[in-house]
């Protein structure tokens, strides 16, 4: 199993609460639609970043497939213009 954690900072003029709700609404439903994606949640962060994405995958291969999956790429079009900074880390369990 692989854990995938991403911290994001949104652009300054973005409504943070609305953005987090939007991002969650397009990414969280991907669980069950993309093979190997076991869990995904979005939450507001409080450590200098605006929100955190936490997800679990069956394997490294599943994480790699998710990153280029058409449903994931389409979902990103709804919010990528809101992002300023992204920091990610993955680790095996």
Locations of regions flagged by a protein language model:
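A generic structural signal for short, non-catalytic loop/turn and secondary-structure boundary residues
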Residues: 35, 81-82
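Short, flexible helix/strand-to-coil boundary loops that buttress conserved ligand/catalytic motifs
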Residues: 67, 76-79
């Amino acid at each position: 199993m692989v854990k995938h954690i991403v911290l994001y900072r949104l652009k300054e003029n973005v409504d943070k609460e609305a953005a987090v709700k939007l991002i969650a609404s397009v990414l969280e439903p991907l669980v069950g639609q993309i093979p190997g994606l076991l869990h995904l949640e979005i939450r507001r962060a409080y450590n200098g970043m605006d929100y955190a994405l936490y997800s679990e995958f069956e394997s490294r291969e599943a994480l790699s497939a998710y990153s280029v999956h058409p449903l994931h790429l389409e979902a990103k079009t709804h919010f990528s213009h809101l992002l300023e900074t992204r920091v990610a880390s993955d680790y095996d369990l």
